[in-house]
Amino acid sequence: MNNTPPVTKNLIIINILCFFAAIVAERYGVNLNDVLGLHYFESEKFRLYQLFTYMFMHSGFEHILFNMFAVWMFGRILETVWGPQRFLFYYVLCGIGAGLVQEVTQYFEFLPVMHDMAQFLTFPSEASIPINGTTRSAEQWVAICQRIISVPTVGASGAVYAILMAFGMMFPNQEIFIIPLPMPIKAKWLIIGYFVLELGMGIMSNDGIAHFAHLGGMIFGFLLIMYWRKKGGGYGRYS
């Protein structure tokens, strides 16, 4: 860590401090992830500042370990190339952008449920409700609604995926070893693979992971780097 540039180092330190602060606060009955995590915008728990604070909170040790390792591995290179101010701007903006994409995703996930729930309340004699081709009991749909409204999004993953996107765009032919792959893979193929994987998981999976927030970070990162390349200034080099 001695050779890690300042913004990268401080981001890792802040995330670790927030992680342990959440553990300590929980012992006193305070759920910091619930306070600082990003809630759905129609929830009574939503606060605008959560679009910033959510990216410093994590759900578990593995979650923060992966994210901070990626920040250290790729972020220090980007900060060296861009400088601390531009790297911090990129990190924060893409993290906020990922949060906005997550909010929009939840809105479209929530909209058909609420529409069909309203129809059910009009004709409450039905034992189950078909929504988007899936039939569940009223209690199950209520549980889904409660999850969307009450469970916050936490983690630096949106910003981390933006960092991966930036690395892949700036160093597309750099070979990277990824466990458990037996051979190195070029950064450009790694980024494409991650994008396709996250898109597929976001559409097909119900694993509780904010896949579209990951995609949002990548998309915001891509657009920002393309803007910098168009504007000029050497922030989007190829190698």
List where the protein language model places each region.
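A detector for small-residue-rich transmembrane helices and their helix-helix packing motifs
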Residues: 1-239
